[in-house]
A protein has these predicted regions:
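Formylglycine-dependent sulfatase
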Residues: 1-322, 329-350, 354-357, 361-367, ...
Length: 415
């Protein structure tokens, strides 16, 4: 994905452009620039598709999601009230705050099924965004009971929430099959960022420490959410299109969430200007028609961190720190080869700086390396003893103060 954090990662996914090009850099900054971007939904709507979304938004006002190209909206990411304009029977309702009963991960999948049933004879695009696994951890007993035995309670909750998502995906697939749409539907399943381990993976009592470990894991990758290590940006990615993409294969080359927009726009027959999107159409690569790698290089910038990958080589920077890894030989990013291959590091550094010149603001970093990121680099990359990272301390901030701060930044609370 394009960032080790949810807001910029989702902005990149839905726009098909590096979010750094339009100034959505991290969760801590305003998402206002995203409003000027054309989303996948807006593009497909112009091509005659009906569009829908359900779940977490996190890209601005939850009552204005429809303005980003979504015809049918079911914003709900917790057991608190949500906002939607179609009910679970597929009937239009007045857009307003709603208080539907049931577990939010079940409800968003049910909404997706209702959307598919209603629009089975039309071309459609649906964006399902479960908040799972993610704090606050809130799986009900019907899911936690599937994972008995001794384990951290936060781990049990994460597995339970993933199980709920899995059930929902199963219901969606069953609905597609019921309406004979399975061979006409391309499905991507992608994580938005790596697991937030907070180094120590503290199993603090629930529901305390809402900004703490969410029970997910990154092994065997190094790092976590908030770093441009593989553990922060390398997430699960599944592509399914029965009869078109051969099943059971592991694609050997790197891809990125930006490719989703480029792929679906190409399949819809829409024309785009050169450079308008940053991804590529993956279908020729997944089918084997094109044997090359989809990308010569991939780049990232997240606040004071930046990285570039070219084949097996990855250059990672964090403030004044710099690392070079051979990901084929060292997928856990443990051996810094900067001194061994200075010529490779220079080539990658030059490409990264050229890429950064087109960002907003320009450059390979947009902020200073904060305390939390410094702790992560100390522990994951420099082998220093683990310090308690800043995010866990920041989670003690009073909720009212945190929500007011988030409102000023254009971030909806509890997302």
């Amino acid at each position: 994905v394009t960032a080790p954090q949810c807001v910029p990662s989702r902005a990149g996914l839905l726009s098909g452009r590096y979010q750094n090009r339009f100034g959505v850099e991290s969760n801590a900054e305003s998402v206002a620039p995203f409003a000027a971007e054309r989303t996948i939904a807006e593009r497909l709507k112009e091509a005659g598709y009906v569009t829908g979304m359900a779940g977490k938004w996190h890209l601005g006002d939850n009552t204005k999601i429809a303005e980003h190209g979504f015809d049918k909206v079911f914003f709900k990411h917790s057991n608190a009230p949500g906002f939607w304009n179609m009910d679970l029977e597929g009937k239009d309702i007045e857009p307003a705050e709603q208080r539907g009963g049931g577990y939010h991960l079940d409800l968003i999948a049910d909404f997706a099924c209702a959307f598919i049933k209603r629009h089975a004879r039309q071309p459609f695009f649906f964006y399902l965004a479960p908040r799972a696994p993610h704090t606050p951890l809130d799986a009900p007993p019907k899911y936690t009971s599937r994972f008995p035995g001794e384990m951290p309670e936060r781990r049990r909750q994460a597995l339970a929430m993933i199980s709920a998502v899995d059930d929902g995906v199963g219901r969606i697939l069953a609905t597609l099959r019921e309406h004979k749409l399975e061979e006409r539907t391309l499905i991507f399943v992608i994580g938005d960022n790596g697991a937030p381990l907070k180094i120590h993976k503290l199993d603090s009592p629930l529901p305390s420490d809402p900004g703490g470990w969410d029970g997910s894991l990154n092994e065997p990758m190094n790092g976590e959410k908030g770093t441009l290590c593989e553990g922060g940006i390398r997430t699960p990615w599944l592509a399914y299109w029965k009869g078109a993409i051969p099943g059971g294969q592991v694609f050997a080359h790197p891809v990125i969430s930006l490719d989703v927009a480029a792929t679906v726009v190409a399949l819809a027959g829409l024309e785009i200007r050169p450079g308008e999107l940053d991804g590529v159409n993956l279908i020729p690569f997944f089918t084997g028609e094109n044997k090359a790698a989809p990308h010569e290089r991939l780049c990232w910038r997240w606040t004071a961190q930046s990285a570039i990958r070219e084949g097996k080589w990855k250059l990672l920077r964090g403030g004044p720190r710099e690392y070079l890894f051979d990901l084929d030989a060292d997928p856990g990013e443990k051996q810094n080869l900067l001194d061994t291959h200075p010529e490779i590091a220079k080539r990658l550094r030059d490409h990264l700086q050229a890429w950064g010149a087109d960002l907003q603001p320009p450059g390979v970093e947009s902020n200073s390396l904060g305390r939390a990121a410094s702790n992560y680099f100390d522990y994951y990359l420099d082998g220093k003893p683990a310090a308690r990272p800043a995010p866990a301390q920041e989670s003690q901030e009073p909720a009212a103060r945190r929500e007011e701060r988030n409102k000023r930044r254009g971030i909806q609370a509890n997302q």
